[in-house]
Amino acid sequence: MSKILVFGHQNPDSDAIGSSMAYAYLKRQLGVDAQAVALGNPNEETAFVLDYFGIQAPPVVKSAQAEGAKQVILTDHNEFQQSIADIREVEVVEVVDHHRVANFETANPLYMRLEPVGSASSIVYRLYKENGVAIPKEIAGVMLSGLISDTLLLKSPTTHASDPAVAEDLAKIAGVDLQEYGLAMLKAGTNLASKTAAQLVDIDAKTFELNGSQVRVAQVNTVDINEVLERQNEIEEAIKASQAANGYSDFVLMITDILNSNSEILALGNNTDKVEAAFNFTLKNNHAFLAGAVSRKKQVVPQLTESFNG
C-alpha cells in the first residue's frame, strides 16, 4: 500500500502544520505509513516554532498523486476549496478538524474526528492519550504551538474548557513555560514590515463559499493596528489583484491586535453591505473597528454566513 499523506489547509498556520506532523507521527507509531506534508511554506510564527524545537518543516506539495499517494488524511480543515489541488482525485480516509463542515463529500466511509475545541492539535493530543502513545518533546511542542496560535494563548472565544489543561500538559512535556513561550511565539508572527502587501493578505487566508459567492477571509496578527492601516492603499491594491486573479466576490481582512484582543475589518467587493450587516457597523474608507473580535472561525465566518444567506 502506498504512503498516506497527512496535511492541513492551504496557507498553513501553526495548527495546520503542527497537527499534521503530530498526527502523522502517531499514525506511524500505530503501524501506518503516513507522511506529513504541507500545502505551503511555514509563516514566520510557525518558522519560530520549528526552529525552537529543532524540527525540519514538512515538504511542500501541490498534488497528492504527484507524490505517489492515493489516500490522504486532512487535519485542521475539511472544505475542499481549502485543500490540496487534486483532493477530488484521491481518497480522504480520515479527517481531524475543529471547523464547520462544508463543501465536503466522499465516495467511501471514513474516520472523522470533529470537536468544537480550540485547535486540531487539541484533538490529536487526545488521540495520543486514547491510543496510549507517548508524546515526544518536539511533537508536544508543535501541538502546543498549534493550540496557542489558534486560541491566541487561550484568550480567544474559541478556547474550549478542556484546552487549558491540554496546554499545561503539552507545555510540561515540551519543557517550556506556557505564558513566556506563548507570547514569544505570537510576537514572532507579528513582524509584518518585511512582508509585501500581496504576502500580507495571503499569510493566513481561507476561501468560503457563501450562498454562491466566493468570499476570501484573511487575518493578520499585529501589536499595532494603525501600523497596518498605514499601508492601506497598497493592501487594497493587493486585495483587488487577488480578487481579479481568483474570482473572489468579496475580500475581508481581519487586522487583529493580539495584545488588546480587538480587530479592524477591511472589506472590499460586491457585497460590502452584507459585511456591514453581519457586524452591525458602517465601513468608513473601507474599514471599521470590531471590538473583542479575534477569531475568524467564531466571530467572523458565522456572521458573514448568516448575512450572505439572509
From Swiss-Prot:
It is found in: Cytoplasm. One of its GO terms (molecular function) is inorganic diphosphate phosphatase activity. Its main location: cytoplasm. It holds the Pfam family DHH. Transmembrane segments: none annotated. It is an enzyme of class 3 (hydrolase). Its cofactor is Mn(2+). GO terms for cellular component: cytoplasm. Binds 2 manganese ions per subunit. It catalyses: diphosphate + H2O = 2 phosphate + H(+). HAMAP family: PPase_C. This is Probable manganese-dependent inorganic pyrophosphatase. It comes from Streptococcus mutans serotype c (strain ATCC 700610 / UA159).
